[in-house]
């Protein structure tokens, strides 16, 4: 019965042709989840830096500036592509930067209270987005296929690729607003939240890479994906959004102790 309800809802949303993406809706969900887990001290600090803007409202800043040539140096921060038989700790960081070094830079810049407010705000907005990217598994995909971009698939008969399926197609066709999606996530107790928040940035990178490897194993080149794929993997989408938000809150709370 659960599967039937899911498929009916999913097919109805697909028919209306919504254009919602992980890069928008997903990042806003992560911001919304994080906002609810901030300490009072962190809330006050963020209010001063962001002039009252919510995390959800600034979560897509890093994507919005991509078209501006002045910010091209930050393009490589959105992902890290790792050779299939390697872990991040086995490789040399790119000279252009990557998702991990980008997050580290953002944390350092926001943490230093001597930096100009303008700089701290810029890197704070980047940080909120990059923690979200870290939890989209294909942003920690394989070097050989550019994080799944070269792994061609079909999505409901239209051309796509594994990266796009996870970046856009599934959330696009599910059709919820970010507030609806955030509210639909499982309720967790304090112990469960604490468990999710454990670990370091590198631990979370390895976790996302492990999930990415499972996603690679779940498809074949040219495969036609549809309802059953979303039903199988939607729980992982929700889990990654929730983890991203809870861990973003942890990072921010530690920045403003």
What positions do the PLM features span?
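Generic cytosolic/nucleocytoplasmic N-terminal low-complexity/intrinsically disordered segments
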Residues: 1-2, 17
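Sec-dependent N-terminal signal peptides
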Residues: 3-13
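N-terminal, motif-rich segments that launch catalysis or mediate targeting to/interaction with membranes
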Residues: 18-130, 137, 142-257
């Amino acid at each position: 019965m659960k599967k039937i309800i899911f498929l009916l809802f999913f097919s109805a949303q697909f028919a209306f042709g919504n254009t919602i993406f992980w890069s928008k809706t997903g990042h806003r969900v992560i911001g919304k989840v994080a906002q609810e887990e901030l300490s009072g001290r962190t809330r006050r600090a963020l209010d001063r830096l962001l002039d009252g803007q919510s995390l959800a409202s600034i979560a897509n800043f890093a994507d919005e500036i991509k078209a501006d040539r002045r910010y091209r140096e930050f393009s490589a921060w959105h992902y890290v592509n790792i050779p299939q038989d390697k872990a991040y700790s086995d490789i040399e960081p790119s000279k252009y930067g990557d998702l991990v070094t980008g997050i580290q830079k953002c944390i350092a810049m926001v943490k230093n209270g001597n930096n100009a407010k303008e700089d701290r705000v810029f890197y704070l907005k980047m940080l909120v987005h990059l923690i979200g990217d870290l939890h989209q598994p294909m942003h920690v995909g394989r070097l050989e296929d550019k994080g799944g971009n070269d792994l061609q698939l079909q999505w409901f008969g239209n051309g796509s690729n594994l990266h796009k399926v996870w970046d856009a197609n599934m959330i696009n066709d599910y059709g919820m607003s970010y507030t609806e999606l955030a509210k639909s996530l499982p309720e967790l107790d304090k112990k469960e939240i604490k468990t999710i928040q454990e670990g370091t940035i590198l631990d979370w990178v390895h976790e996302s890479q492990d999930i990415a490897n499972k996603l690679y194993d779940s498809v074949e080149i040219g495969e036609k994906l549809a309802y059953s794929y979303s039903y199988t993997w939607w729980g992982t989408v929700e889990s990654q959004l929730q983890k991203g938000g809870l861990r973003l809150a942890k990072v921010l709370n530690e920045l403003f102790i």
